[in-house]
């Protein structure tokens, strides 16, 4: 039997029997006598112990709030058993909740013990750090990176004015490469995102809307974070190079990148034009040109005449000539192929022709004596044409053009062209007086009528003393080429 004591009296109220609606049955009986204070009151500690053993927490709070037991009226005394039952049921429910909470705390404590003692704990933490705590790791390392970048920027700002032209061009080429890499990173990220959206849509079609989100959200966030880190690193390098070049910082969007590229291209074009005007830089090889530069042709021609017996260079000679002339190896080889056909072969043919003609003249001296009347006839025709200043009568198969240029009173020069239709030959006779005097005499006329090949020409020179010197076409061609 459970007993309740009332302050100031020793009446004992019997508790009613257990009702089936209640969840617990209390059959304990308390026979312990409680010590009283000097005011004949029950000590509060004993009362709290009894009520706590019965689960009467709410009544214990009411006792503490009220401070003492108070007398009730008769109607309250009649209702006391019903209230006592209701209080008992609430106390039983609170005890159940406390028991459940205690069990839950015991289970959680058991789980924590097993997790801390597990051998998979470290591996799971590393996986979570890779997938979830990437931003935290970046934030931890970000201040050091910012400090390093600040130091680099200060050093570059101090050395901006001291950058030579070669390093500036190298930095510009590196900047263009980084910009192309940045575009490639953006393009690959767009491609990855598009493929991920295709996978998500296929999951949604089969399993329903939003079915792929638990599987693809984490992967998409991780890959996008990696792409973002890579893009930030490349952008940082681009900004550092721009600051080192002394240019203004452009925005990180596409417009800023396009404007910076246009600026770099414009700057390079202006520098190349300025160098070409000064003559420091040769024009690009891919531009159409009429032949090779004169300096390069002089070097190649000198090598050709030095190695006249073997006019085509070896591979090592080609590399050496390409370095000396500033041309490519293919251009050097093409020039020697053309020169061997156009210059070297005709010169060799003329040399052999001269040798054969000299041998014939030595073997046939009568032929040289027969040629002397022809020379005298040509000289007479020239004197007559100078007096008549017109065509020579009696010569039907020849056309003659005469041009006389006078310089001063004591010297003159006469040029006469004659082309014979029968033999197809051409003779040029120069009459010079007072050859001891020095000075240049202008000469004109007759050159535009030379339409025959140079291999069939014979040049005869007559001075005032009527000495004849025959000049072969090979010697003239050699002088022209050299």
From Swiss-Prot:
This is BEL1-like homeodomain protein 7. PANTHER family: HOMEOBOX PROTEIN TRANSCRIPTION FACTORS. Residues 363-401 have a biased composition (Polar residues). CDD domains: homeodomain. Residues 358-401 are annotated as: Disordered. Residues 167-238 are annotated as: BELL domain. It comes from Arabidopsis thaliana (Mouse-ear cress). May form heterodimeric complexes with TALE/KNOX proteins. The keyword DNA-binding applies. The gene is BLH7.
């Amino acid at each position: 039997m459970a007993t309740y004591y009332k302050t100031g009296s020793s009446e004992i109220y019997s508790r009613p029997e257990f009702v089936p609606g209640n969840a617990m049955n209390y059959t304990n009986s308390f026979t312990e006598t409680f010590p009283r204070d000097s005011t004949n009151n029950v000590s509060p500690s004993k009362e709290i112990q009894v009520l706590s053993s019965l689960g009467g927490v709410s009544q214990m709070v009411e006792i503490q709030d009220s401070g003492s037991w108070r007398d009730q009226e008769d109607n309250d005394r009649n209702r006391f058993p019903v209230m006592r039952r209701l209080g008992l049921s609430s106390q039983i429910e609170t005890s159940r909740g406390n028991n459940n909470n205690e069990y839950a705390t015991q289970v959680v404590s058991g789980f924590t013990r097993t997790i801390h003692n597990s051998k998979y704990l470290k591996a799971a933490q590393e996986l979570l750090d890779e997938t979830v705590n990437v931003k935290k790791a970046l934030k931890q390392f970000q201040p050091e990176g910012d400090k390093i970048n600040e130091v680099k920027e200060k050093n570059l700002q101090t050395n901006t004015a001291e950058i030579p032209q070669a390093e500036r061009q190298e930095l510009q080429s590196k900047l263009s490469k980084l910009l192309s890499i940045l575009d490639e990173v953006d393009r690959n990220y767009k491609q990855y995102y598009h493929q991920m959206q295709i996978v998500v849509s296929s999951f949604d079609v089969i399993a329903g809307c939003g079915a792929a989100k638990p599987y693809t959200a984490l992967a998409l966030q991780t890959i996008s974070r990696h792409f973002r880190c890579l893009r930030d690193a490349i952008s940082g390098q681009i900004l550092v190079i721009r600051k080192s070049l002394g240019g203004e910082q452009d925005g990180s969007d596409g417009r800023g990148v396009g404007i910076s590229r246009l600026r770099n291209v414009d700057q390079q074009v202006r520098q190349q034009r300025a160098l070409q005007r000064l003559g420091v830089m040769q024009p690009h090889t891919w531009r159409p040109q009429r032949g090779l530069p004169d300096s390069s042709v002089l070097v190649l021609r000198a090598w050709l005449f030095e190695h006249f017996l073997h006019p085509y260079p070896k591979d090592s000679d080609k590399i050496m000539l390409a370095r000396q002339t500033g041309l490519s190896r293919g251009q050097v080889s093409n020039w020697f192929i053309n020169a061997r056909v156009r210059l070297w072969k005709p010169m060799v043919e003329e040399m052999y022709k001269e040798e054969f003609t000299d041998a014939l003249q030595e073997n046939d001296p009568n032929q040289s004596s027969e040629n002397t009347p022809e020379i005298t006839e040509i000289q007479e025709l020239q004197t007559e044409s100078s007096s008549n200043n017109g065509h020579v009568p009696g010569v039907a198969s020849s056309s003659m053009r005469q041009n006389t240029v006078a310089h001063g009173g004591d010297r003159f020069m006469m040029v006469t062209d004659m082309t014979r239709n029968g033999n197809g030959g051409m003779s040029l006779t120069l009459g010079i007086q007072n050859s001891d005097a020095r000075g240049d005499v202008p000469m004109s006329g007759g050159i535009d009528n030379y339409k025959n090949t140079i291999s069939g020409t014979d040049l005869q020179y007559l001075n005032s003393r009527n000495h004849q010197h025959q000049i072969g076409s090979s010697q003239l061609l050699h002088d022209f080429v050299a």
